[in-house]
Structures are given as C-alpha cells and as structure tokens.
Regions:
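Right-handed parallel beta-helix
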Residues: 2-11, 26-37, 50-63, 75-97, ...
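Extracellular beta-rich repeat passengers
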Residues: 129, 134, 139-308
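Extracellular calcium-associated, cysteine-rich motifs in secreted modular proteins
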Residues: 308-378, 456
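Surface-exposed or secretory-pathway low-complexity segments enriched in glycine-proline
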Residues: 380-422, 447-449
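Beta-strand-rich extracellular modules
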Residues: 424, 436-440, 532-536
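A short beta-strand micro-motif common to beta-rich folds, especially ectodomain repeats
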Residues: 427-441, 447-449
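C-terminal edge beta-strand
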Residues: 441-456, 542-545
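C-terminal outer-membrane/trafficking sorting elements
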Residues: 462-474, 478-547
Length: 547
C-alpha cells in the first residue's frame, strides 16, 4: 500500500511490462506505465481489484487474454487518461473451449469509482462491463461515474452489466469495421440483490461506420436499453432517470470536445507515445484498422500480438545512480542543484524531497514529478526552443489555430503550429507556458509546456562569504510588509522570486541606511522567497520566509 509508480521519470521510451500483470493496492498512484502481456497465460492486464483510494492515470494496456482492466470490489478509485486496446480476441482463454472469442476491455466496479477521459479501441467485448458490488446485507452499493470516454471499434459488446447508480455522460462511441452491436449501454436487471439498478444517460454520441452521427448527443433515449434476467420482474422505479445521481469532481466536456481532448492526451505518452499507441490513436481518428485476427479474420480484433507485428524495440538504458541521484532521495542531482537543495544528503534523509519550499501544498518531490509529467524542453539562455504543437493536439484536426495564453519569464510566439519560446536573459530555472488550440468547430483545449533554463534557478545560488554590499530586510519571517535598506543611498531595483526562480514581484525605490523600501508581500503564499537587489552596479541576494 501507499505506493507511487511514476513512470514518467523513466528514461528512453519509458517502461513496458510484458508476460505478467500489474496490480495496484490501496492508497496508491500509478502513472505513465505500459502493460502489454501477449499470448500465453490467461491474465488480466492492470488490476485495481479490492483497492481503496487509488488512482491510475495515463497508462496503456493491451494484448491481454482475460481482461485488460478490472476493479472488482474496489472503493474510491479513479481511472483516467488510460488507453486500453487490442485485447486478444480468440486467444485460448483457459476457461473457455478452444475457438471462443473474448477480447474484453475491462470490468469497472467499485462502491465509488470515476472512469473518465479514457480510450478503448479494438476490443471485442466489455467496453465496459459495469460489474456491481453487493454489501454484506445483499444490497447493491456501487456508484460509478463514467464520462468523457472514447470507445472505438467495439465488437459484439459495448457497455453492459449491472450497477446500482451509474452516471453515463458525454461519452463518444465510434463504430468500427468489427462493430456489430447497435446500443452502447445495456443495463441487466438482476433477480437478486436489494435496491435499485439505474443509470443516468445523457449527452452520449454514437458515430456510424461511415462517419454519420446516429446520435449527436441530444437524444438521451437512443442507444440505451435494459434487460430482465430470469426471475426478475419489471422494475417499479425509473431505470433511466432524468437527473444525475451525484456530482462529478472533474471537468466534464461535451462528447465532441472529449473526443478531441482524449485523442490529444491519453495513454503512456511520457517520456513519449510509443509506436503502438500512435497507431491506435491514428486508427481511431481515421476510423480505420491495420491488422486482422489470425484466427477469426475480424478487422482490428487481433488474436495474438504477432498479428500486429509483435513487440517494438524498447532500448535498454542504464543510469549510474551515483551520478544521477547521489543521495537516493528521489530528486535527481540536477534538480537539487538547480533549486539549492543538497544532492549529498545522508543516507535515509528525505528532508529535501519531503519539504515544501514554496509552501504551495506540494512537496519538492511532487514538484519534480509534476515537471516530469508535463511535456518539457530545455533551452539555453539567449536561445529559442521551437516546439511542434500538433503532437499534443492530435484530436483537433479541423483547421487548428494556436495561441499563447500564459507565460512568465520569457516570450512566446506561434508560427502556424510551431511554438517558439525564448526565456528572459536574466532568468534561470523552470517556467511553464500555456497554449490553447481552437478548431473550426469552436472546440478548444489548453495545455502547458515546461521549459528548463540553465543549471541553477535565479536567486537560489549560494550566497558568497564576501557580500558585495550590506542589505537589511526585516521582519524575517514576514507576514505583510517587508522593509529593505542598504548601506548606500540611491535607487535600487528589487526583484522577489519564489523557490523555483519565478519572479513574483519587482519594484524600484530609493533606499539608504536610514530610509527603507516598504514592500507589500501580503499577497504571497507562505513559503521561501529570494530578494535580489541591484544598486550602483552591485547585486545581492538574500532569503526570506513569508508566513
């Protein structure tokens, strides 16, 4: 329990597990991981069965024999931005006669579960299966929030199963060459268990094989059905009520916008999106397929990984930890040196990684993991980095237009689909650039890019033993006003930077030994800051704490 798998920190093409499944336990986070099992043993791919308070984000699962994903018996879980594809169809499942087709994407279950912004592609069945949970008294208890998912080339089964309360909102189902089923949601009312089995169904789009919309999201009765199991009677309640059962705690896009957002940002795409997942995204966009099953001949539904060309090359990369993370605290040396931390902490000392230097609620380790989970680039001072934005906006195909919506510590321009970023001459450290893509249909999405400049953040360089001139700043720690004075008289340029080198306040004022400059820092969050003062050609940097 309490494990974080941060696959975004892997070198090369990232991590790919084969031949054995991955299980996530309680209070854990799994991000940016690939699981491609291949034919052989009847395994699931990625499991959250029985877990509590856990998250899976930006993972890729394919080539599984049983189910690609399962969360039976779980509580309080989230599966998001994950790509599930090419579950092996006629692959010799140990529990079925030879020749039986399977190809299941997954069973989603749990007393409270959120499943959103995922892509399911080229899976024959269980796209998804909603497997309900029953408590010790025999009462249905599951509450599932299923929204903004994209499902492509689902074969003989779309989403079906039994569930207590299901929000099924703004999903995008796109038929493919192997799709044979008409509805996208089938509730199966059981003849056992106490309580209701219901679904709130709204805003879902169904696209036909020829690209026409069978449901543009406005008909909330089209594409849904329910069935009665043997021994069950007609429900006395509304199976499909008109109001959601509970609020969602993530942004819900329209189904059309979700389609574009998901196909722009899904799966294990850091350090990079591998060749397999690039193909899956491309085929979903095109409504195409490349491979057929060697046993069934079904289009897009492969039966063995060899049908799709087998495993691509993942280079073996060896890192010398003595050079990369000398003190083994999870923060690489370059990060600690950039932000004035100690890359040579004693063994077992995690004070640097667990500290929250900028007091924003996230530890230094979390700040590093966020950087690694964001598309990022490195540029030298005085140079410009050029970034092709199309690889971050694959879903926006219709005349995309790009604009820069936020930047600090540099300038950014867009030339067609190329973003050009130039840091300020005086800046060193890390900053982020937000850009927005808008297409001809008015759909828009904002993403951010990280930029690393130099080897040390401005303001966090060690203060030399010999100061250029005396600076007095008080009170320290400070709550509202910081008073700054110097040993000489004259105009001074004052710049305040946070722990990561980002400028948060600049001021020019006249200071002297007897007249202090009054700086209002009340608006700053709690944390460590650096004050850089320049006067008469001299420069000095001091540290202060904002309470």
């Amino acid at each position: 329990e309490q494990i974080t798998i941060a696959g975004q920190t892997a070198p090369g093409k990232g991590v790919c597990f084969r031949a054995a499944p991955i299980g996530i336990n309680s209070e854990s986070v799994c991000r940016f991981l690939r699981i491609r099992l291949g034919g052989g043993t009847t395994y699931d791919g990625l499991g959250m069965a029985g877990t509590n308070h856990s998250i899976v984000d930006h993972c890729s699962v394919s080539w599984t024999i049983d189910e690609a994903f399962s969360s039976r018996g779980a509580k309080n879980l989230t599966l998001q931005r994950t790509l599930i594809s090419e579950a092996l169809n006629c692959a010799g499942h140990q529990n079925y006669p030879a020749g039986t087709e399977h190809g299941y994407a997954g069973t989603i279950s749990g007393q409270t579960g959120s499943f959103h912004h995922n892509l399911l592609a080229h899976c024959n069945g269980r796209n998804w299966s909603v497997g309900d949970a029953i408590d010790g008294s025999g009462t249905w208890v599951s509450k599932l929030d299923v929204f903004n998912n994209v499902v492509y080339n689902y074969g003989s089964r779309a989403t079906d199963g039994e569930v207590h309360k299901l929000n099924f909102v703004n999903n995008y189902y796109k038929k493919g060459a192997a799709t044979t089923v008409g509805h996208i949601l089938k509730l199966e009312i059981k003849g056992f268990g106490a309580g209701t089995e219901q679904a709130y169904y709204s805003g879902n789009i169904i696209e036909d094989k020829n690209g026409d919309l069978l449901n543009d999201g406005t008909d909330n009765q089209f594409g849904r059905i329910y069935t009665l199991d043997s021994g069950s009677s007609e429900p006395t309640y509304e199976v499909f009520p008109d109001e959601p059962f509970f609020p969602s705690y993530a942004t819900i896009h329209t189904a059309k916008d979700a389609y574009k957002s998901v196909l722009s940002d899904v799966g294990c795409n850091l350090p990079l999106l591998d060749e397999h997942d690039q193909r899956i995204v491309r085929e979903t966009l095109e409504g195409s397929y490349t491979y057929v099953g060697s046993e069934t001949g079904k289009k897009g539904l492969i039966d063995n990984e060899a049908d799709a060309g087998g495993y691509e090359n993942y280079p073996e990369i060896t890192i010398d930890l003595d050079e990369f993370d000398t003190d083994r605290d999870g923060l690489p040396n370059w990060w600690e040196e950039m932000f004035g931390l100690n890359p040579n902490s004693p063994e077992g000392d995690f004070s640097d990684s667990n500290a929250d230097d900028d007091r924003d609620g996230y530890t230094n380790l979390e700040e590093y993991l966020h950087w690694m989970a964001t598309p990022h680039y490195e540029v030298k001072t005085g140079e410009t980095v050029e970034i092709d934005l199309t690889k971050y906006t694959r879903g926006f195909e219709k005349n995309p237009v790009y604009t820069v919506t936020k930047i600090d510590n540099g300038t950014a321009t867009v030339d067609g689909n190329i973003l050009k970023i130039t840091p300020e001459e005086s800046f060193g450290g890390i900053f982020y650039v937000d850009f927005t893509v808008t297409d001809a249909e008015g759909s828009a999405c904002t993403r951010n890019i990280g930029v690393k400049v130099g080897d040390r953040a401005v303001g966090v360089e060690p203060v030399s033993d010999t100061r250029q001139f005396a600076v007095n700043a008080y009170p320290n720690p400070v709550t509202d006003y910081l008073y700054v004075s110097t040993e000489s008289t004259g105009d001074a340029k004052i710049q305040v930077m946070n722990a990561y080198g980002n400028s948060v306040l600049t001021e020019t004022c006249n200071v002297s030994p007897n007249v202090a400059c009054k700086l209002d820092v009340s608006f700053l969050p709690m944390g460590i800051y650096f004050l850089k003062i320049q006067q008469e050609g001299l420069s000095e940097t001091i540290k202060f704490i904002k309470k």
